[in-house]
Protein backbone atom coordinates (compact mmCIF):
# COMPACT_ATOMS: atom_id res chain seq x y z
CA UNK A 1 0.00 0.00 0.00
CA UNK A 2 2.82 2.40 0.84
CA UNK A 3 4.41 1.92 -2.58
CA UNK A 4 1.08 2.79 -4.28
CA UNK A 5 0.89 6.05 -2.34
CA UNK A 6 4.53 6.82 -3.20
CA UNK A 7 3.86 6.03 -6.88
CA UNK A 8 0.84 8.37 -6.98
CA UNK A 9 2.70 11.18 -5.22
CA UNK A 10 5.79 10.76 -7.37
CA UNK A 11 3.94 11.00 -10.67
CA UNK A 12 1.64 13.78 -9.51
CA UNK A 13 4.74 15.96 -9.19
CA UNK A 14 5.49 15.57 -12.88
CA UNK A 15 2.50 16.96 -14.72
CA UNK A 16 3.26 17.40 -18.40
CA UNK A 17 3.86 20.98 -19.52
CA UNK A 18 0.89 22.69 -21.13
CA UNK A 19 0.65 24.33 -24.54
CA UNK A 20 -1.78 27.25 -24.70
CA UNK A 21 -3.02 28.33 -28.12
CA UNK A 22 -4.49 31.84 -28.23
CA UNK A 23 -6.67 32.87 -31.16
CA UNK A 24 -6.75 36.66 -31.31
CA UNK A 25 -9.63 38.32 -33.16
CA UNK A 26 -10.43 41.93 -34.01
CA UNK A 27 -6.88 43.07 -34.77
CA UNK A 28 -6.07 45.94 -37.12
CA UNK A 29 -4.12 44.13 -39.87
CA UNK A 30 -0.47 45.04 -40.42
CA UNK A 31 -0.42 47.66 -37.67
CA UNK A 32 2.19 47.44 -34.93
CA UNK A 33 2.62 44.56 -32.52
CA UNK A 34 0.62 42.52 -30.06
CA UNK A 35 1.96 42.59 -26.52
CA UNK A 36 0.59 39.68 -24.52
CA UNK A 37 1.24 38.59 -20.95
CA UNK A 38 0.25 35.63 -18.79
CA UNK A 39 -0.07 36.15 -15.04
CA UNK A 40 -0.34 33.21 -12.63
CA UNK A 41 -1.60 35.08 -9.57
CA UNK A 42 -3.37 38.24 -8.46
CA UNK A 43 -0.08 39.54 -7.06
CA UNK A 44 1.67 39.01 -10.40
CA UNK A 45 -1.16 40.78 -12.25
CA UNK A 46 -0.89 43.84 -9.98
CA UNK A 47 2.66 44.22 -11.30
CA UNK A 48 1.47 44.40 -14.91
CA UNK A 49 4.94 45.29 -16.20
CA UNK A 50 6.33 41.87 -15.25
CA UNK A 51 4.14 39.01 -16.51
CA UNK A 52 5.13 35.44 -15.71
CA UNK A 53 5.21 34.68 -19.46
CA UNK A 54 5.14 37.18 -22.32
CA UNK A 55 5.39 37.52 -26.07
CA UNK A 56 5.55 40.40 -28.51
CA UNK A 57 4.52 39.51 -32.07
CA UNK A 58 4.03 41.54 -35.23
CA UNK A 59 0.49 41.85 -36.50
CA UNK A 60 0.02 40.01 -39.79
CA UNK A 61 -2.20 40.61 -42.81
CA UNK A 62 -5.35 39.27 -41.14
CA UNK A 63 -7.59 40.53 -38.35
CA UNK A 64 -7.23 37.09 -36.74
CA UNK A 65 -3.93 35.65 -35.56
CA UNK A 66 -2.87 32.62 -33.51
CA UNK A 67 0.07 32.40 -31.11
CA UNK A 68 1.10 29.71 -28.65
CA UNK A 69 2.78 29.54 -25.29
CA UNK A 70 4.53 26.24 -24.61
CA UNK A 71 5.88 24.63 -21.47
CA UNK A 72 3.40 26.22 -19.05
CA UNK A 73 2.85 24.60 -15.66
CA UNK A 74 -0.69 23.66 -14.69
CA UNK A 75 -2.63 26.37 -12.86
CA UNK A 76 -4.74 29.50 -13.14
CA UNK A 77 -3.66 32.26 -15.52
CA UNK A 78 -4.97 35.65 -16.52
CA UNK A 79 -4.17 36.53 -20.14
CA UNK A 80 -3.94 40.24 -20.97
CA UNK A 81 -3.03 41.72 -24.34
CA UNK A 82 -3.15 44.91 -26.37
CA UNK A 83 -2.29 45.95 -29.92
CA UNK A 84 0.54 48.46 -29.79
CA UNK A 85 -0.30 50.24 -33.04
CA UNK A 86 2.35 52.96 -32.79
CA UNK A 87 5.15 50.83 -31.32
CA UNK A 88 5.71 52.84 -28.14
CA UNK A 89 5.57 49.69 -25.93
CA UNK A 90 2.65 50.91 -23.83
CA UNK A 91 -1.12 51.03 -24.16
CA UNK A 92 -2.04 54.56 -25.18
CA UNK A 93 -4.70 56.40 -23.18
CA UNK A 94 -6.56 59.67 -23.62
CA UNK A 95 -6.57 62.49 -21.06
CA UNK A 96 -9.23 60.65 -19.02
CA UNK A 97 -7.04 57.53 -18.79
CA UNK A 98 -9.24 55.57 -21.21
CA UNK A 99 -7.30 53.19 -23.51
CA UNK A 100 -7.26 54.26 -27.15
CA UNK A 101 -5.67 51.04 -28.46
CA UNK A 102 -7.50 47.71 -28.67
CA UNK A 103 -7.08 45.31 -25.75
CA UNK A 104 -8.37 41.95 -24.55
CA UNK A 105 -8.51 39.73 -21.46
CA UNK A 106 -9.09 36.03 -21.02
CA UNK A 107 -12.64 34.85 -20.28
CA UNK A 108 -13.77 37.57 -22.71
CA UNK A 109 -13.85 40.00 -19.79
CA UNK A 110 -14.05 43.57 -21.10
CA UNK A 111 -14.49 46.10 -18.30
CA UNK A 112 -14.63 49.72 -19.31
CA UNK A 113 -14.19 51.49 -15.99
CA UNK A 114 -11.67 49.32 -14.15
CA UNK A 115 -9.04 46.67 -14.60
CA UNK A 116 -10.60 43.22 -14.13
CA UNK A 117 -9.73 41.24 -11.04
CA UNK A 118 -7.56 38.17 -11.41
CA UNK A 119 -10.51 35.91 -10.55
CA UNK A 120 -12.78 37.56 -13.14
CA UNK A 121 -10.42 36.90 -16.03
CA UNK A 122 -8.40 33.87 -14.91
CA UNK A 123 -8.59 30.59 -16.80
CA UNK A 124 -7.62 27.15 -15.50
CA UNK A 125 -5.00 25.26 -17.50
CA UNK A 126 -5.04 21.53 -16.76
CA UNK A 127 -4.84 19.59 -20.03
CA UNK A 128 -1.67 19.23 -22.13
CA UNK A 129 -3.24 21.36 -24.87
CA UNK A 130 -5.60 24.26 -24.19
CA UNK A 131 -7.09 26.83 -26.56
CA UNK A 132 -8.72 30.20 -25.84
CA UNK A 133 -9.99 33.17 -27.82
CA UNK A 134 -9.18 36.83 -27.19
CA UNK A 135 -11.47 39.45 -28.77
CA UNK A 136 -9.64 42.73 -29.18
CA UNK A 137 -11.82 45.81 -28.78
CA UNK A 138 -11.39 49.47 -28.06
CA UNK A 139 -13.14 51.23 -25.21
CA UNK A 140 -15.68 52.80 -27.56
CA UNK A 141 -16.67 49.47 -29.22
Predicted regions and their residues:
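Bacterial Sec-dependent N-terminal signal peptides
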Residues: 1-19
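Surface-exposed loops/turns
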Residues: 29, 61, 73-74
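A short tyrosine-centered beta-strand micro-motif
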Residues: 75-81
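Acidic, glycine-anchored loop motifs typical of Ca2+
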Residues: 85-93
Amino acid sequence: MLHIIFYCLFFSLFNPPITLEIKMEGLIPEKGTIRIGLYNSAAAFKDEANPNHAQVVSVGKNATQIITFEGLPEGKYLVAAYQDVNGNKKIDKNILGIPTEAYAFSNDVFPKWKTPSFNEAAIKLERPYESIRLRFRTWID
